[in-house]
A protein has these predicted regions:
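C-terminal lobe helix-coil module of Hanks-type protein kinase domains
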Residues: 165, 194-195, 199, 209-216, ...
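Conserved N-lobe ATP-binding subsite of Hanks-type protein kinase domains
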Residues: 96
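Short N-terminal regulatory/linker segments that flank and modulate the kinase catalytic core
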Residues: 1-87, 111, 180, 241, ...
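AlphaC helix of the eukaryotic protein kinase fold
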Residues: 117-137
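A short, aromatic-enriched beta-strand patch in the conserved N-lobe beta-sheet
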Residues: 148-150
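Conserved short submotifs of the Hanks-type protein kinase catalytic core
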Residues: 154-168
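Glycine-rich ATP phosphate-binding loop
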Residues: 99, 108-117
Length: 352
């Protein structure tokens, strides 16, 4: 028996879940559905309980359905286009990652291939192809490039990513006692990459330490840019994303609530990452506390208006200038001026 279309189930569930039970049944009866889809949707709606948001309930009800999807479509040695799969490097909520190498004889190239979970409908596959074109144009020294993409013989989308050498951000920081200045420089590299992507109208939506690699020279590379966007079933009229994939602990409140999100969601995630990078010792500084607080406000409108402004405040802190997040009056600004000019001020005082 054919499985119900996953993308359509998502759409129908979202339409019906907030209706009263009687209206749900009436709408369900009026829909032109095959028996399997109707029964699957009815089970999902019947299991809906509690006060969670529609998006949260959707994730919970779809999880059981997703578990039944065959994950054995591809294996080491399989060929996807011009790429031959190597060993599996890992598996996560979004799919499995394989090492890969190019085998068409044009030139030698190593890559990482992420095979995404699920089998989208033809309409969703068309959206995925369009989104891949956008992501493939992201060219920044701190963003891992999207090289290629397609679908497996059984219809699962895959992405071919630049292979990046380095350690996860959290592992990199735990293995070496980096001073504050170097930690902030790493963070500013991340901000530069995210700001660049935002200028191309691409939001990451899943920024976290495991998606940030640091090489032996202290250079940052952001992974999985736009993967959450690719997994989304659609985009709103104004181009902002209604995302459904996220990592608890780093996701913004609006992302967790299933609301429409934009650049402010990435600002929030960067604020959480900055807090973790600084640890208890460095984050006690009042200016840094203010920066983190501003970036992680619950209300997106009260955060930094852009990642660029967040990075700018970090830059001001590094050089002893007042930070926007503090606001502050003449006393605060005066104290920062004295810090910047301390040697000269101290010298003058000796002669007064």
């Amino acid at each position: 028996m054919a499985r119900p279309d996953l993308a359509r189930l998502k759409s129908l569930f979202t339409q019906l879940v907030d209706l009263p039970s009687r209206e749900q049944e009436a709408e369900l009866a009026a829909l032109s559905l095959d028996r399997e889809t109707r029964e699957q949707l009815r089970r999902m709606l019947a299991a809906d309980v509690g006060e969670a948001s529609a998006a949260t309930r959707l994730r919970e009800q779809m999880s059981e359905f997703r578990e039944g999807i065959d994950e054995s479509d591809v294996a080491e040695g399989d060929q996807l286009g011009v790429w031959q799969l190597g060993p599996m490097l890992g598996r996560g909520g979004m799919g499995a990652v394989f090492a890969a190498r190019r085998t068409d004889g044009q030139f030698k190239q190593e890559a990482a291939i992420k095979v995404l979970q699920g089998r989208p409908s033809p309409q969703a596959l068309a959206l995925l192809a369009a989104e891949r074109q956008i992501l493939a144009r992201l060219a920044h020294p701190h963003i891992a490039r999207l090289l290629d993409g397609g679908s497996t013989p059984k219809g699962r989308p895959y992405l071919v990513m630049e292979q990046v050498q380095g350690k996860r951000l959290d592992q990199y920081l735990s293995r070496r006692p980096l001073p504050l200045e170097q930690r902030l420089l790493l963070f500013q590299q991340m901000c530069a990459a995210v700001a660049y992507a935002h200028a191309q109208l691409v939001v990451h939506c899943d920024l976290k330490p495991s998606n940030i690699l640091v090489d032996q020279d202290g250079q940052v590379s952001l992974l999985d840019f736009g993967i959450a966007r690719l997994l989304d079933a659609g985009i709103s009229d104004d181009g902002s994303q209604v995302a459904k994939a996220y990592t608890p602990g780093y996701a913004s409140p609006e992302l967790q609530n299933g609301d429409t999100v934009g650049a402010a969601s990435d600002v929030y995630s960067l604020g959480i990452i900055l807090k973790e990078m600084l640890g208890q010792t460095f984050s006690r500084n009042a200016d840094l506390q203010a920066i983190i607080t501003r970036a992680t406000r619950t209300d997106p409108a009260k955060r930094y208006e852009s990642v660029t402004l967040l990075a700018q405040d970090v830059e001001h802190f590094r050089h002893g200038y007042p930070v926007r997040a503090r606001g502050g009056g003449w006393l605060y600004r005066g104290s920062r001026m004295l810090r910047r000019r301390w040697p000269a001020s101290a010298g003058v005082s000796l002669f007064l």
